[in-house]
Amino acid sequence: MYYFHKFNSFDYHIYVMSISLAVLILILLNIYISFKGFKDIIFFEKFHFNINSIKNGEYYRFISSGFLHVDNQHLLFNMITFYFFGDFVLNALGIFWFYILYIFCLLSGNIFCYLINYSKNNYSAVGASGAVTGILFSAILFYPDLQLALLFFPIPMPGYFFAIIYLAYTFYGIKKQNDGIGHTAHLGGAVGGILLSLFYNPNIVVSSFKTIILMIIVIFIGIVYFKKK
């Protein structure tokens, strides 16, 4: 995923970022723990997200599972996305609240996943997607002029438009549950990112008013769609 900033009506510039130490530390931690999980199945089984294990009191899995990944592609996609948006949020929040946001979104994603899949004792998952999605949505709120583009669809789009498309697809994925993607964690992470960003700086209600209203509308429609038989 690339990010763009619009200079004028016709010109878009792709930034090449230098990475901050705070972002680099989390990326390296994800890489180290994920590769250990790739090589050590006992380690992976002990720390991945599993409904039955959490019911039995292994609550650490809410955090530990967020640093494991299924494979190199899964890890790479999450870390590339985090690389592109991490420094945006770090600059807006400062290092302390940046780390609070990361962990909060990781937790909110996994807790939401736990609640939605509570009856499925064998349900398992891994990945930093909840935290990364929260970082992404926080960046969209703090930088309302941010333009985004997907690697496979390299046409810039406004952040608010990307957000509503992402949320709509996430609800669709939760409803269908047929693609092996942790959409529930994505949604929980996104909501966590929105809420903590608003808590940290309520003024973004004004600067990103349109984005917030559209998000609320999509989430409301998504809840209705999800509950529909």
Give residue ranges: language-model regions.
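A detector for small-residue-rich transmembrane helices and their helix-helix packing motifs
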Residues: 2-229
